[in-house]
């Protein structure tokens, strides 16, 4: 049996590089609220480990309609079980989760956590963008390639050379660890840079692109191979993740073709598979996503084939799985993750959405309507949900 665990704090555990990491209360709360999320990508017969009590009949009618055969078990009960897990599928791997599972005899898997941390650094973007085909045939002339900056002086020089730039910490949680610079040196910039240099050793410097669209290519690494899973289109607000499209790969690829040639997308996909087979396979098994953009430069559109690499499960794969398994192929929609200031606000939103968007099924799939994907308890402040229309 495979046991699934939603541990979004893993990104910060990797960033700090510590063998033991205690996340802040807001991250603990978020991981508890969304701990049922793996239900939607786990396989029949497997089990989701949760950090809260969820009634056995939660979403019973919906799960019956969708024929979901996945169980769940509170993490504390799991620790008391005598048998070791056949296979652990966490949201992400780090020293923290690996050491905890091994120490308690709950995982027989071997992971090179130091290598996984190295492979999770943003500096790997430089290696991908240096692939000859990408450098010569994909990116526009005048594109400023990301730079690894190891001193405040080198960061200052980079910022002054660019009208607008984005500085990134090598490791951070998604959408975090960014500093937007406007070509001037300020005390806050220096403080941020010095802090990142002290903790992580270098800063990534990148040009600010004229972004048209965010999307990703999703892959899965197995023991000997790397396979292409599909596309994901994601929605951001001020750099913060909000949700994903629920669409077919064909629909998303046709949309991308309005900006760039399909042959270019396919060639980049194949090159990334080769890159990950060479550098990642053998050290990591699981999902990974490559964040990309359609950018505009001098009135033309270009593919930015590697903004960031997420060496872990990600919301794009979740949305892709939901569409493939549970959404009527005549329908489309959106997958959202959202947080509220109070529990009452979340409950009011949930009640309003249920009333305004009744759930309709067709042939064991969702045809239209609203459905929450995570359990809403007495103190829940974050949730995942879908909105589908035909």
Residue ranges and their predicted role:
Residues 1-39, 44:
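N-terminal-proximal low-complexity accessory segments that begin disordered
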Residues 163, 188-243, 293-306:
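Phosphate-binding site of ATP-dependent enzymes
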Residues 27-41, 49-154:
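Conserved N-proximal alpha/beta basic substrate-recognition cap immediately N-terminal to
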Residues 198-202, 207, 241-302, 339-366:
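A long amphipathic alpha-helix within ATP-dependent nucleotide-binding catalytic cores
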Residues 328-390:
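Peripheral (often C-terminal) accessory segments that flank ATP-dependent C-N-forming ligase machineries
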Residues 145-146, 164-189, 216, 239-256:
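Glycine-rich phosphate-binding loop of ATP-grasp-fold ATP-dependent ligases
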Residues 212, 235-238, 264-272, 303, ...:
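Charge-biased, low-complexity intrinsically disordered regions
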Residues 219-274, 310-337:
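ATP-dependent carboxylate/phosphate-activation module, predominantly the ATP-grasp catalytic core
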């Amino acid at each position: 049996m495979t046991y699934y665990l939603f541990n979004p704090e893993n990104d910060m555990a990797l960033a700090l590089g510590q063998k033991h990491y205690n996340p802040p209360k807001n991250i603990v709360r978020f991981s508890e609220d969304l701990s049922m999320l793996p239900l939607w990508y786990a396989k029949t017969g497997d089990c989701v480990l949760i950090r809260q009590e969820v009634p056995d009949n939660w979403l019973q009618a919906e799960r019956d309609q969708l024929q979901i055969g996945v169980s769940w078990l509170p993490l504390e009960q799991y620790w008391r079980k005598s048998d070791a897990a056949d296979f652990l599928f966490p949201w992400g791997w780090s020293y923290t989760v690996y050491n905890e599972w091994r120490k308690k005899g709950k995982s027989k898997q071997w992971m090179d956590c130091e290598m996984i941390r190295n492979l999770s650094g943003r500096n790997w973007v430089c290696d991908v963008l240096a692939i000859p085909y990408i450098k010569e045939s994909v990116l526009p002339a005048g594109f400023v390639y990301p730079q690894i900056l190891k001193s405040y002086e080198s960061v200052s020089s980079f910022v002054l050379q660019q009208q607008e730039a984005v500085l990134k910490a090598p490791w951070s949680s998604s959408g975090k660890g960014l500093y937007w610079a406007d070509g001037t040196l300020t005390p806050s910039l220096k403080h941020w840079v010095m802090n990142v240099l002290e903790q992580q050793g270098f800063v990534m410097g990148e040009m600010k692109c004229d972004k048209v669209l965010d999307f990703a290519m999703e892959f899965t690494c197995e023991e000997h191979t790397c396979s292409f899973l599909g596309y994901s289109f994601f929605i951001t607000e001020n750099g913060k993740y909000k949700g994903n499209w629920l669409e077919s790969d064909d629909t998303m690829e046709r949309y991308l073709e309005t900006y760039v040639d399909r042959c270019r997308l396919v060639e980049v996909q194949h090159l990334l598979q080769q890159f990950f087979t060479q550098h990642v396979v053998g050290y990591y098994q699981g999902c990974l996503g490559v964040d990309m953009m359609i950018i505009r430069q001098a009135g033309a559109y270009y593919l930015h084939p590697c903004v960031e690499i997420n060496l872990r499960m990600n919301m794009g794969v979740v949305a892709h799985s939901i569409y493939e398994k549970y959404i009527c192929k005549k329908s489309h929609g959106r997958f959202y993750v959202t947080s509220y200031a109070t529990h009452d606000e979340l409950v009011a939103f949930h009640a309003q959405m249920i009333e305004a968007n009744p759930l309709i099924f067709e042939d064991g799939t969702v045809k239209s309507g609203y459905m929450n994907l995570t359990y809403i308890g007495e103190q829940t402040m974050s949730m995942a949900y879908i909105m589908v229309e035909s």
